[in-house]
Amino acid sequence: MLGLDENQPVSKKRKRTVPKSDEKSGRRIHENITRDPVIANSHSSGGQVLLLEKQIQDSQRHYNNIVTLYSLATSQAEEEKQRLAAVAALCRVFCRLLADGRLSKSNGASQNDLVVVDWLKARYADLQNFLLECVSSIDTFNMTALTLSMALIKSEMSNPRTSLDQLWRTGFFSRMLATILESSDNEDLLHKFVDSYAQQFDDVRHYTFVIIA
């Protein structure tokens, strides 16, 4: 499984509870989210990855680059830095696609366009499943996988394809929260979620309580 820089400090285990549901920060996840330095630094990791990402951004003719990036991210044969760069690039790609409405079927769309949307949604599901697998792993990459997952969730909430309430209750967020709660051997993961998200964003805290109630 992927790992971060071994020099990066690992938080000490401590007791932590989800903040009370009536404690308000006045912030929502789609309004702001702190970027993990590892995600930002991945821009400088691997010219091949950046080229593939740019080609996807330039034209849908290069959407097959998504498959290539996914292969790089999941391949045990690739260097750790390259794999991390690839999965971060994939998240940026899908954040843009969500913002552009490319994962939504529009009225009057051609059959070819509908096929493309279905294909993109399938690739997005692949990425989500991979991130959840990483979140559930007992290594330091699960922290970055959590941050990447929350970045995608932010994009989903900013560009909803259905009602926000349904997205929170049944979408990627609910699956990710279940994965965190099932990772009983990794308290640091829960601490990260509580400190960075549940305490910081009203909507994350509210739907955390809604889902676990």
Question: What are the residue ranges of the model-derived segments?
Answer:
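Charge-rich, low-complexity intrinsically disordered regions
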Residues: M1-A213
